[in-house]
């Protein structure tokens, strides 16, 4: 709304409506060789952990740019969120698919009373890889940001959760978010603890620990197509 000179006439600017794009998962590639190479060899994610998420159709390789796609589902099993991560290390692209709902970002529901919140899916997978014992029994979420929305949605959907572990990055943004969310949880009388990675993030901890040895190869990890299968078979 603008004033026209000194005459006082009000000129109303037209309202520009943004086109709503319905949420749609990126098309799947028929092979996942780049995905497995990136997550297993470059990022050091444990093979058994990764395969479990792939088997549940929570991770796949996109057909267009061969991104790793991390899918979040609602309680009815409908995809509501997808985070894309480039598999080319020289071009570290990352972003959420248009119209993704942040409260349903990449997460795992277990039956124990523990929930672990991370910034990125790869940090979540790295932490699980380092703490594999009974990992499926716990709950995890990756906000794909420093948001707390997936946490509070999981608290709503999973009444078993009584203890929350805040695991954001070891930097100013991550630790500021950890403290902000901890204050919210304290007001709700929900037990919580802040876990800080030794290095920048949990994937760096995983790699420094030796999981991403440069001597590893696809053969050492048994990455035959018959084992990893294709997206169409999953």
Language-model segments: residues:
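Phosphate-handling DNA/RNA-contact segment within nucleic-acid enzymes
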Residues: 63-157
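Short glycine-/small-residue-rich flexible loop motifs, especially phosphate/cofactor-binding loops
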Residues: 36-37, 124, 182
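Conserved aromatic-histidine-acidic binding/catalytic patches
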Residues: 27, 113-115, 169
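Basic, glycine-enriched DNA-binding surface that flanks or lies within the catalytic cores of DNA
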Residues: 4, 8-102, 106
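Generic non-transmembrane alpha-helix signal with a bias for helix starts/N-cap capping motifs
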Residues: 32-33, 120, 178
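TOPRIM fold recognition
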Residues: 129-234
């Amino acid at each position: 709304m603008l004033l026209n000179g000194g005459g006082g006439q009000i000129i109303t600017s037209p309202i520009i409506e943004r086109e709503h794009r319905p949420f749609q998962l990126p098309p799947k590639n028929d092979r996942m060789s780049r995905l497995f190479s990136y997550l297993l060899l470059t990022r050091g994610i444990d093979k058994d952990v990764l395969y479990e998420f792939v088997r549940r159709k929570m991770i796949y390789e996109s057909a267009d740019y061969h991104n790793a796609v991390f899918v979040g589902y609602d309680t009815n099993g409908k995809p509501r969120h997808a985070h894309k991560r480039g598999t080319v290390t020289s071009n570290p692209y990352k972003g959420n698919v248009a119209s993704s709902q942040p409260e349903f970002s990449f997460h795992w529901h277990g039956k124990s009373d523990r929930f672990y919140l991370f910034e990125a899916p790869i940090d979540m997978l790295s932490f699980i890889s380092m703490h594999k014992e009974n990992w499926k029994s716990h709950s995890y979420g990756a906000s794909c940001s420093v948001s707390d929305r997936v946490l509070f949605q999981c608290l709503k959907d999973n009444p078993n959760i009584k203890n929350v572990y805040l695991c954001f990055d070891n930097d100013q943004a991550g630790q500021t978010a950890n403290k902000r969310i901890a204050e919210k949880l304290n007001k709700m009388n929900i037990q919580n603890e802040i876990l800080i990675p030794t290095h920048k993030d949990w994937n760096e901890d995983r790699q420094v620990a030796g999981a991403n040895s440069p001597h590893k190869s696809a053969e050492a990890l048994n990455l035959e197509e018959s084992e990893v299968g294709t997206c169409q078979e999953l």
